[in-house]
Regions:
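Helix-enriched interaction subdomains in cytosolic or periplasmic regions
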Residues: 1-35, 287
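Active-site and donor-binding regions of nucleotide-sugar-utilizing enzymes
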Residues: 21, 25-226, 247-249, 262, ...
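Conserved catalytic-core segment of nucleotide-activated headgroup transferases in glycan assembly
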Residues: 68-82, 221-303
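Nucleotide-activated donor-binding/catalytic signature segment of Leloir-type glycosyltransferases, i.e.
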Residues: 101, 106-109, 284-316
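Hydrophobic beta-strand scaffold residues
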Residues: 152-154, 297, 355
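Catalytic binding pocket for nucleotide-activated donors in carbohydrate/polymer assembly enzymes
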Residues: 183, 322, 326-408
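Donor nucleotide-activated moiety binding/catalytic core segment of transferases
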Residues: 216, 298-340, 344-345
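C-terminal alpha-helical cap of glycosyltransferases
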Residues: 413-427
Length: 427
């Protein structure tokens, strides 16, 4: 049956994906950049390998995008501590990872080659890594099957599955069964993920499966530790500021009127407004909307420094600063929950902020933990956002327990990176 699925994937699915990608490059710059980068990946690998002595141990990590790399980074750092002379290759699927990750712990960075069997087998044969390691969900069947044929152990960590995952549908499950069973080791985030995986494997695999947690908690904690000493004060000692982070158009349509109402009702309140895509048209539209309501707006960009004493509304036109900005707020709203799914809620949690987000959070274990602990809330409409934030702003006895509950979610989940590194080395 595996050969049947190989034929379907290699000669039907992948060609269709490539055709769609070739059409999409005329409309989407990210697709264009990604596809162009994939055609050069083998050349980059060959040049890198030719510069090595020949006896180095190489570990190849794959992360779909920036978010998955943030799960991967603490694992790479932990592996480097144990094996300081190991070489690290990291492949990315998305330009958001490739373009924004510049880390000294990475020895070679590439776009993931197109998942044609001949292409990925050639790349693996060239590199011959000790292990091929995937982060979270972005797995590519031919890459896994080729590694298995070349006897290169494959590892999947921070594996997670949607509650109603389509991977367990009868025909689809049979396909993914033949993909996942070729992994050497799989480390899931939760016991529920472990149970989904067991249903897929059907006890017919030699794959080692363990529940080891999510290393992204370790990354968030490690990042916060670098500047926490500057921000040891309670949320009640900070400026009364709400961080509206990673805002999509769908978020704006739902919450914008409620945000204005909060600003009108609380004179000392200020906000940081952080669009998900900080392109010029989005930034200018945000500025114009707040100006039309009578609010002076300052912009935080590469050219304009951030001033904590800025007026009521600050629009953020720069990426990579949210983890720091959260420490200047007392409450956070994290976007994406009215469209594709919520963004990173761990960073505001470690900054001790009560967190609100939209209804699409079910596939994010950390969001569920925040809700269960009292550190976060899902809202379905703008009125719910207003009521919850208004309650927190009006009653200090509500905001402090929520603040402590949010940060406790992070602290009780750290340590996964160490467990994953141990598994990579020992399993």
């Amino acid at each position: 049956m595996k050969y049947f699925w190989f034929f379907v994937y290699e000669f039907i699915i992948i060609p269709i994906m490539v055709i769609i990608g070739l059409i999409g490059i005329y409309f989407n710059k990210k697709l264009r950049d990604g596809l162009s980068g994939r055609f050069h990946s083998r050349k980059v690998l060959k040049n890198y390998i030719n510069d090595l002595n020949g006896d180095e141990k190489i570990y190849w990590f794959h992360a779909s995008s920036l978010g998955e790399y943030l799960q991967t980074k603490p694992v790479i750092l932990g592996l480097k501590e144990v094996k300081p002379h190991a070489k690290i290759i990291v492949s990315f699927f998305s330009p958001s990872g490739y373009n924004h990750v510049n880390d000294e712990s990475i020895d070679c960075k590439i776009y993931l080659p197109l998942d044609f069997y001949w292409a990925v087998k050639s790349a693996l044969h060239l590199v011959r890594p000790e292990k091929l390691i995937f982060a979270s969900y972005d797995i590519w069947p031919n890459l896994i099957w080729a590694a298995n044929e070349l006897e290169i152990p494959t590892v999947l960590f921070a594996a997670r599955f949607k509650k109603e995952t389509g991977k367990l549908l009868p025909v689809v499950r049979n396909f993914y069964h033949h993909v996942y069973k070729d992994f050497h080791s799989i480390y899931t985030i939760t016991k529920s993920d472990h149970n989904h995986l067991e249903l897929m494997l059907k006890n017919s695999s030699n794959t080692t499966v363990r529940v080891l947690g999510n290393p992204r908690y370790d990354h968030v904690k490690g990042t916060a530790d670098k500047f926490t000493m500057e921000h040891t004060k309670s949320v009640l000692s900070r400026k009364k500021r709400i961080i509206f982070a990673s805002i999509h158009d769908e978020d704006q349509r739902v919450i914008y009127d409620s945000v204005l109402q909060l600003l009108n009702d609380h004179e000392s309140l200020s906000i940081l407004w952080v669009p998900h895509e900080p392109i010029a048209s989005v930034i200018n539209a945000s500025i114009q909307r707040f100006n039309e309501e009578g609010y002076k707006v300052n912009v935080f960009s590469k050219q304009t420094p951030y001033d904590k004493d800025d007026p009521q509304v600050i629009v953020v036109d720069i990426v990579g600063v949210l983890s720091h900005l959260y420490w200047d707020g007392i409450i956070a709203y994290v976007g994406g929950g009215f469209s594709s799914g919520i963004h990173n809620v761990m960073e505001p949690a470690i900054a001790r902020l009560p967190i609100l987000f939209g209804p699409k959070y079910e596939n994010f274990h950390e969001a569920e933990e925040l809700i269960n602990s009292g550190g976060g809330w899902a809202i379905d409409n703008g009125q719910e956002l207003f009521d919850k934030i208004n309650m927190l702003l009006s009653d200090n006895s509500k905001i402090i327990p929520a603040s402590l509950a949010a940060t406790d979610v992070i602290h009780k989940n750290i340590g996964a990176a160490t467990r994953v590194v141990r598994g990579i080395i020992r399993d």
